[in-house]
């Protein structure tokens, strides 16, 4: 192994709104608590904490721009009128041998593939009718907005060979089990 080869792995979790990414990641975080091989990244978002949303750190636009300019993010992007960032410290976790798991936008997959040689892209998906039902139950968007959102959804597998898809249309426990199985496989392969 070369000295500059990371010991750990970056696991990028992507998928459409309503697929259950946060639910599965939260369950996996609980199941893996205390296992130092795994590190779940807490995102930084230009949105204050609200009930029913992911647990994250908040920055206003000016502070976020300053942090980005100072290189404090490993990755950052803009989506749905908000800015998102992952702290630069995740690189230290990977260098130290951890499997680092983060919910990201498909917009940064090319950056992830360029920056992280040891990586896996996990697509959490669900059937369109399931996504529509879940989005409607949140009560944040009109029926028309949900239809427009679903019409914009695109595939995540671009043939790069690093994609694992988990269909979360059914029981979330089965999807979480599949996600945990994948994470354990990565840990066995990447951590000596």
From Swiss-Prot:
<protein>
    <recommendedName>
        <fullName>Ribose 1,5-bisphosphate phosphokinase PhnN</fullName>
        <ecNumber>2.7.4.23</ecNumber>
    </recommendedName>
</protein>
<dbReference type="GO" id="GO:0005524">
    <property type="term" value="F:ATP binding"/>
</dbReference>
<comment type="function">
    <text>Catalyzes the phosphorylation of ribose 1,5-bisphosphate to 5-phospho-D-ribosyl alpha-1-diphosphate (PRPP).</text>
</comment>
<dbReference type="InterPro" id="IPR027417">
    <property type="entry name" value="P-loop_NTPase"/>
</dbReference>
<keyword id="KW-0067">ATP-binding</keyword>
<dbReference type="GO" id="GO:0019634">
    <property type="term" value="P:organic phosphonate metabolic process"/>
</dbReference>
<keyword id="KW-0808">Transferase</keyword>
<dbReference type="GO" id="GO:0005829">
    <property type="term" value="C:cytosol"/>
</dbReference>
<dbReference type="GO" id="GO:0033863">
    <property type="term" value="F:ribose 1,5-bisphosphate phosphokinase activity"/>
</dbReference>
<comment type="similarity">
    <text>Belongs to the ribose 1,5-bisphosphokinase family.</text>
</comment>
<dbReference type="InterPro" id="IPR012699">
    <property type="entry name" value="PhnN"/>
</dbReference>
<dbReference type="InterPro" id="IPR008145">
    <property type="entry name" value="GK/Ca_channel_bsu"/>
</dbReference>
<feature type="binding site">
    <location>
        <begin position="15"/>
        <end position="22"/>
    </location>
    <ligand>
        <name>ATP</name>
    </ligand>
</feature>
<comment type="pathway">
    <text>Metabolic intermediate biosynthesis; 5-phospho-alpha-D-ribose 1-diphosphate biosynthesis; 5-phospho-alpha-D-ribose 1-diphosphate from D-ribose 5-phosphate (route II): step 3/3.</text>
</comment>
<keyword id="KW-0547">Nucleotide-binding</keyword>
<dbReference type="GO" id="GO:0006015">
    <property type="term" value="P:5-phosphoribose 1-diphosphate biosynthetic process"/>
</dbReference>
């Amino acid at each position: 192994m070369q000295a500059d080869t990371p010991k750990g792995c970056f696991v990028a979790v992507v998928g459409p709104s309503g697929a259950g990414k946060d639910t599965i990641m939260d369950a996996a975080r609980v199941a893996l608590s205390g296992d130092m091989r795994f590190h779940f990244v807490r995102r930084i978002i230009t949105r204050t904490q609200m009930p029913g949303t992911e647990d994250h750190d908040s920055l206003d636009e000016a502070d976020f721009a300053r942090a980005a300019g100072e290189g404090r993010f490993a990755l950052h992007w803009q989506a749905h009128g908000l800015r998102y960032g992952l702290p630069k410290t995740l690189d230290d976790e990977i260098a130290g041998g951890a499997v680092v798991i983060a919910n990201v936008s498909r917009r940064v997959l090319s950056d992830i593939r360029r920056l992280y040689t040891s990586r896996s892209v996990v697509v959490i998906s669900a059937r369109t009718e399931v996504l529509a039902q879940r989005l409607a139950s949140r009560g944040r968007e009109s029926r028309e907005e949900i239809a427009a959102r679903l019409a914009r959804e695109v595939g995540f597998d671009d043939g790069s060979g690093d994609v694992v898809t988990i269909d979360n249309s059914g029981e979330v426990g089965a999807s979480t089990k599949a996600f945990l199985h994948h994470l354990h496989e990565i840990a066995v392969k990447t951590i000596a």
